[in-house]
């Protein structure tokens, strides 16, 4: 299944706010109206919607998300929390959380076009897994820095999560540590996502 490229507002009206997909928000009460029209949701549908929320927020294909779930399932600790850590530490998401891009698809484009360096080397793989002490910088070229500066100026001021530091004037971000669960930028019940996949096998 390919990455979603359809109408974004349609998705947030059904699933709620997806800041990684779009900065738009559903109108207040739209969730309740949708729920009343569709009647009581089945447990399967609730799990499916949480999975879809995760997939659309981080801009993943079904195959990519399944791969992350399997990796998380083999790691120590809570599968759901490890899954969120894996997704949050992707380079495209780190750029988004730093405010260097307004959405994750926009961050993915920055990476694909070679504007971003990790520890002094160009990385053009959006799924690159960042680690503590990684230094993310914008390429020292005028078009790269002008592009990111415009995005920084356009992004709404938000408090950075504690696992990241941003040095705006140096066009540099630092990964301080693995993200804490409470700093994840999406309202999600990750256990329902894990349950969804465990019932598919």
Curated annotation (Swiss-Prot):
SMART domains: Ribosomal_S4 (SM01390), S4 (SM00363). Part of the 30S ribosomal subunit. Contacts protein S5. The interaction surface between S4 and S5 is involved in control of translational fidelity. InterPro entries: Ribosomal_uS4, Ribosomal_uS4_bac-type, Ribosomal_uS4_CS, Ribosomal_uS4_N, S4_RNA-bd, S4_RNA-bd_sf. It comes from the Eukaryota. One of the primary rRNA binding proteins, it binds directly to 16S rRNA where it nucleates assembly of the body of the 30S subunit. It comes from Arabis hirsuta. GO terms for cellular component: chloroplast; small ribosomal subunit. GO terms for molecular function: rRNA binding; structural constituent of ribosome. Transmembrane segments: none annotated. Residues 89-152 form the S4 RNA-binding domain. Its main location: plastid. GO terms for biological process: ribosomal small subunit biogenesis; translation. This is Small ribosomal subunit protein uS4c. It is found in: Plastid, Chloroplast. The lineage of its organism: Eukaryota, Viridiplantae, Streptophyta, Embryophyta, Tracheophyta. Residues 20-44 are annotated as: Disordered. Keywords: Chloroplast, Plastid, Ribonucleoprotein, Ribosomal protein, RNA-binding, rRNA-binding. Belongs to the universal ribosomal protein uS4 family.
């Amino acid at each position: 299944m390919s990455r979603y490229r359809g109408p974004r507002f349609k998705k947030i009206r059904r699933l709620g706010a997806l800041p990684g997909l779009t900065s738009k928000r559903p109108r207040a009460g739209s969730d309740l109206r949708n729920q009343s029209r569709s009647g009581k949701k089945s447990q399967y549908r609730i799990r499916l919607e949480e999975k879809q929320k995760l997939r659309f927020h981080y801009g993943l294909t079904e195959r990519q998300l399944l791969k992350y779930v399997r990796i998380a399932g083999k790691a120590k600790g809570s599968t759901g929390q490890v899954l969120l850590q894996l997704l949050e530490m992707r380079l495209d998401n780190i750029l988004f959380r730093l405010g260097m891009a307004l959405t994750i698809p926009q961050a993915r484009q920055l990476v694909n076009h070679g504007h971003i360096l990790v520890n002094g080397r160009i990385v053009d793989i959006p799924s690159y897994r960042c680690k503590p002490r990684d230094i993310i910088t914008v390429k020292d070229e005028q078009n790269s820095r002008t592009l990111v500066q415009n995005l920084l100026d356009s992004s709404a001021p938000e408090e950075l999560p504690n696992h990241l530091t941003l040095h705006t004037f140096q066009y540099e971000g630092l990964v301080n540590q693995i993200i804490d669960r409470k700093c994840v930028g999406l309202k999600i019940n990750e256990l329902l996502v894990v349950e969804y996949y465990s019932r598919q096998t």
